[in-house]
């Protein structure tokens, strides 16, 4: 038993495409989701959005925080009502060309503040700025320096909203175990170590993604890899 264990959790994204396609999740399906989650009793939820299906209209470049809000609001309400900690974030910038855009930083943080402070969803405790930024499938393509710079800019923008900054911290670096992008200088442990060195005060919780197979788990190799990564996390911080 570990006091650092936060419980089992789930990835629960808010069906971004469904609303945009005019095929919203039905009330019956929401009831089924609630019933299943009631049984699971997750300790936390990771909720990621695609901004072009939410606050950013790619056709016009317009920012609209009320756009396609219903399903995200319903998901967060369930988490709020049931005391579930949420790590919320964005898979990628609105367009890949905006991966280092201050416009994205400002829109994204304003939207986060809207969710947490205006709508009252302070179940959101952590904010993820890129999904798996070490991956060659990400807009960052393993560029640690770009990711670090954006993390610093996001944190600085969050500081402009004092209530938000008090309630929400970064979850990082959100990288993939057992993977090394040839374009990146660092492996998983290296990303965690460098982010701790460069952003230790800004990161509230450290997170990595793991996709282990049965043999890796049963052989003990997976636990050993986790120990190596955990060793890079500063004392007093969770992974």
Role assignments for model-derived ranges:
Residues 74, 204, 211-239:
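Glycoside hydrolase catalytic-domain groove-lining segments
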Residues 1-126, 135-136, 141, 145-179, ...:
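Non-catalytic accessory regions flanking glycosidase/transglycosidase catalytic cores in CAZymes
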Residues 88, 208-209:
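Short beta-strand->loop
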Residues 108-111, 180-199, 218, 222-226:
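Distinct, well-ordered alpha-helical segments
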Residues 130-132:
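Active-site neighborhood of divalent metal-dependent phosphoester/pyrophosphate hydrolases
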């Amino acid at each position: 038993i570990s006091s650092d264990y936060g419980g089992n959790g789930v990835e629960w994204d808010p069906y971004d495409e469904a609303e945009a396609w005019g095929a919203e999740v039905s009330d019956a399906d929401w009831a089924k989701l609630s019933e299943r989650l009631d049984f699971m009793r997750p300790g936390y939820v990771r909720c990621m959005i695609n901004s072009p299906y939410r606050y950013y209209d790619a056709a016009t470049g317009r920012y609209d925080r009320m756009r396609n809000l219903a399903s995200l609001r319903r998901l967060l309400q369930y988490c709020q009502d049931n005391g579930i900690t949420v790590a919320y974030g964005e898979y990628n910038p609105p367009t890949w060309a905006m991966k280092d855009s201050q416009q994205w930083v400002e829109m994204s943080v304003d939207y986060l503040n809207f969710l947490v402070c205006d709508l009252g969803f302070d179940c959101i405790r952590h904010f993820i700025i890129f999904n798996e930024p070490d991956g060659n499938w990400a807009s960052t393509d393993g560029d640690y320096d770009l990711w670090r710079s954006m993390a610093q800019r996001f944190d600085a923008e969050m500081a402009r909203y004092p209530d938000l900054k008090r309630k929400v911290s970064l979850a990082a670096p959100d990288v993939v175990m057992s993977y090394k992008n040839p374009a990146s200088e660092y492996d998983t442990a290296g990303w965690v170590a460098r982010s701790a060195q460069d952003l230790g005060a800004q990161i509230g919780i450290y997170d990595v993604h793991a996709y282990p197979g049965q043999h890796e788990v049963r052989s003990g190799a997976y636990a050993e890899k986790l120990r190596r990564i955990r060793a890079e996390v500063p004392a007093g911080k969770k992974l």
